[in-house]
Amino acid sequence: MARIGDGGDLLKCSFCGKSQKQVKKLIAGPGVYICDECIDLCNEIIEEELAETSEVRWEELPKPREIYEFLEGYVVGQEPAKKALSVAVYNHYKRVQAGENGGGAGREDAIELAKSNILLLGPTGSGKTLLAQTLARMLNVPFAIADATALTEAGYVGEDVENILLKLIQAADYDVKKAETGIIYIDEIDKVARKSENPSITRDVSGEGVQQALLKILEGTTASVPPQGGRKHPHQEFIQIDTTNVLFIVGGAFSGLEKIIESRAGAKGIGFGATIRSKLEIQASDQFQEVMPEDLVKFGMIPEFIGRLPVLTSVHNLDREALLQILIEPRNALVKQYQRLFELDGVELDFEREALEAIADQAILRQTGARGLRAIMEEVLQSVMYEVPSRKDVARVVITPDVVRNNVNPTLVPREPRTIGKNDGGRHEKSA
């Protein structure tokens, strides 16, 4: 087998047949041997296969209209934001594909396509995170969410900005090539606004310092990421990741920005013939629809940071009708989710229309938007979710408006009496 000669003292590789004298190293296994050359060849084959599978490729990149229609299935309302995101995401990945295919590289007149990161403004619970998650799901690219409030400038207590990239690498199962075409959503970016419009003399490590630290990775750079997260130290190995093709979607509530927009817009409404808009008219429209980069600078974002987020779009507060749609219309609507949970116990769950309206009203009162709907549903259904799995006599649960408004018990509809057929002598008996 692997031994040559009568003495049995000369061994050979079980794969290529070379003797131990012809190779540098021969490694023994249970009844087999492999040489260093075959190991190198195996590594090369595996690396080539991984390189082929790690690149995110589409047979055909979805067009903006197709992206918009996919978002429609999961996100209610917010049409302007969905259109802006559809176009921005399409252009971004078209640029990525052009780069992979050469894209005119080497030509003197070659045009370098710049990256278009996105700034998404809007109140909490209006669908910012869901929009980003749904985009990543459609495109089948790695996706990571980061909270800007946890970040600090390098060298201070808190998370380095490179830890955001580590989350993306982890989402890609440590496949760096795949991570380099992913999407990162940074939430609560308004919380790292500097304290005043003018540059700070003292060190603002969790505000302006974070914005400064994010500039390079937003624009596109090769970053060194510690594999285990945490702080960098000189004796550890780093993962190198190029952020040139990573799409950054940055979101925040920007509470108070509407006053800055209003004061700027109000200043233009002075003089004869000027268009005067009441506060009600401004509130009726999207409060961030008229935002300008200078408004964001006044809010506390540094100009360099805003410059790296060229696509500005916003989502608005959800009204009662939109919240009702969220409860029942999307593919993964909350009502459908809870109906499925009850169905697994063999029980139907029904909501009266007025009960759903009462749930929407509660979310508006709490000012939690769509995010608060699940919490309200949990409160409404908690007692019945505790009781029903232990009972075999309940066929249907009906949620009435009083259940939501006055905390009364839901209506439990018993199962129909079970009939025993002719073969059993025509007897009838009721289920327990």
From Swiss-Prot:
SUPFAM superfamilies the UniProt entry points to: Glucocorticoid receptor-like (DNA-binding domain), P-loop containing nucleoside triphosphate hydrolases
Residues bound to Zn(2+): C13, C16, C35, C38
Keywords recorded for this protein, A-Z: ATP-binding, Chaperone, Metal-binding, Nucleotide-binding, Zinc
GO CC terms: HslUV protease complex
Organism the protein comes from: Streptomyces griseus subsp. griseus (strain JCM 4626 / CBS 651.72 / NBRC 13350 / KCC S-0626 / ISP 5235)
Residues covered by region (Disordered): 411-432
Name of protein: ATP-dependent Clp protease ATP-binding subunit ClpX
SMART domains: AAA, ClpB_D2-small, zf-C4_ClpX
GO molecular function: ATP binding; ATP hydrolysis activity; ATP-dependent protein folding chaperone; protein dimerization activity; unfolded protein binding; zinc ion binding
Record-linked PROSITE patterns: CLPX_ZB (PS51902)
Signal sequence interval, chain numbering: none
ClpX-type ZB domain boundaries: 1-54
Highest taxon of the lineage: Bacteria
Pfam families found in the cross-reference section: AAA_2, ClpB_D2-small, zf-C4_ClpX
Subunit structure: Component of the ClpX-ClpP complex. Forms a hexameric ring that, in the presence of ATP, binds to fourteen ClpP subunits assembled into a disk-like structure with a central cavity, resembling the structure of eukaryotic proteasomes.
